[in-house]
Amino acid sequence: MKNDINNQQGSQQQVPPIDNPFLTMLGVQFLENGDGQAHIALDLTEQHMNSWQITHGGVLMTLLDVVMAVAGRSLHPDQKGVVTVEMKTSFLQPGGVPGGRLDAYGKAFFQSSTMCFCEAEIRHGERLIAKAMGTFKYLKQLRAGERMRKICGSD
């Protein structure tokens, strides 16, 4: 999967990075996307660690989820976005320590007009850390947050 992205650089149509305060707080870097593929990275700090001082599994799952969403979204840049319907994650090795860097690679392998099916992996250098598969639904309109504010009476 890693090499697929590098081999496609010339033909990619970039999708704007996701405007997400959580991802900004984590420090996620959006490096490449287009043609159903994506690459993001995270420079690890103490805040990304669990009690054993290795990368927290929730951080790894977030990277996998986001890189698959960006890959799927790159096939339909005219859509508002995608939401995760289902995700399966396999943790293969501990995910890195402060000062390290994780690279996540995503690929959309099948799509319909409303759904996209993706796979992703995270690497720490050459070490394969985790893999995932996910199903995503394309959205055209209202953001879930906007809808929830209306339901909860915040607007």
Predicted regions and their residues:
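Terminal targeting signals and extreme-terminal segments of soluble enzymes
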Residues: 1-155
